[in-house]
Amino acid sequence: MLKVGWKASAEQFGPRELVDHTVRAEQLGFDSVFISDHFQPWRHRAGHAPFAMSWLAAAGERTERVTLGTSVMTPTFRYNPAVVAQAFGTLGALNPGRIILGIGTGEALNEVAVGAAGSPWPEFKERFARLREAVTLMRRLWTEERVTFEGDYYRTHDATIYDRPAEPIPVYVAAGGPLVARYAGRSGDGFICTSGKGRELYADQLLPAVDEGLSRSSRTRDDIDRMIEIKLSYDRDPGAALHNVRFWAPLSLTAEQKHGVHDPVEMERLADELSDEQVAKRWIVTSDPGEAVEQIRQYVDLGFNHLVVHAPGDDQARFLDQFSADVLPGLRGL
């Protein structure tokens, strides 16, 4: 069954506003809400960066049904994975069956400012090794009573998570390339990526790598949630749909451009040098509900079963109402 969620854009809005929109999303029939976890936003001016774990607790208390998770959190530098396991154990105990931990290898923007990672920013090999070790430790803490762990990066001695749900928290692994996607298939409860990067990336690299990982662990596609953040700027006003994407210009920077940038002022400067055409190409920009559905359909046809819609505009209430009335019924029919 296709699931449709809403992305709570923590880099753009404050915590109270995001909670209120989450309540509205649940009322309108969305299945999930995922929040980003940034220490610093993509933009210095008008940016926000609420603490995701506190926010999830508040959102959980204001909602009843919707699944809540991170997309994504880095449990390896500014957080100790044992503390992340404790926090998500508490969230899972408060909201049984509704909490997901989405994780990634991290960005300099969020880790260097607090001294959690050195300069230069660690290369991918170390970041990926930390991620795998963190997942192993967190899962042991969620399932075992006394955990002594001696890893390359993290250690515990007779550690116990006393408040946790009956079932371990699902771990969704975000990947932008086949190596981590393969790991997601082998070890993840879910796989996360973002839209707008060319069909070949998903069809020829990411999803085949997930399938390879599944095969190596004797699992099938039914054993993993295949989630994609859909970058959708939908508005009944075509001009507004195009204008709204400008705030999110940093997403159109290449990985090479963003690598090692730890200052939101510098990130904003780089993003503002991009043309409107460069910014818009990452997004589905439309005022036509049918076109929105058809553009999104390509990801469903590729095998994604969980769509989390990220809308760029500053009026999220307007988007939620228009999208749920105009586009969501068509997606439910896919």
Curated annotation (Swiss-Prot):
Alphabetized SUPFAM superfamilies for the sequence: Bacterial luciferase-like
GO molecular function list: coenzyme F420 binding; glucose-6-phosphate dehydrogenase (coenzyme F420) activity; oxidoreductase activity, acting on paired donors, with incorporation or reduction of molecular oxygen
Binding site for coenzyme F420-(gamma-Glu)n: D37, T74, T105, G106, N110, G176, G177, L179, V180
EC category: oxidoreductase
Cystine crosslinks: none
InterPro entries, per the entry: F420-dep_G6P_DH (IPR019944), F420-G6PD/mer (IPR050564), F420_G6P_DH-rel (IPR019945), Luciferase-like_dom (IPR011251), Luciferase-like_sf (IPR036661)
Active-site residues, record numbering mapped to chain: H38 (proton donor), E107 (proton acceptor)
Keywords: Carbohydrate metabolism, Oxidoreductase
CDD domains named in the record: Tetrahydromethanopterin_reductase
Reaction catalysed by this enzyme: oxidized coenzyme F420-(gamma-L-Glu)(n) + D-glucose 6-phosphate + H(+) = 6-phospho-D-glucono-1,5-lactone + reduced coenzyme F420-(gamma-L-Glu)(n)
GO biological process: carbohydrate metabolic process
Subunit structure: Homodimer.
Role description: Catalyzes the coenzyme F420-dependent oxidation of glucose 6-phosphate (G6P) to 6-phosphogluconolactone.
Protein name: F420-dependent glucose-6-phosphate dehydrogenase
Gene (UniProt): fgd
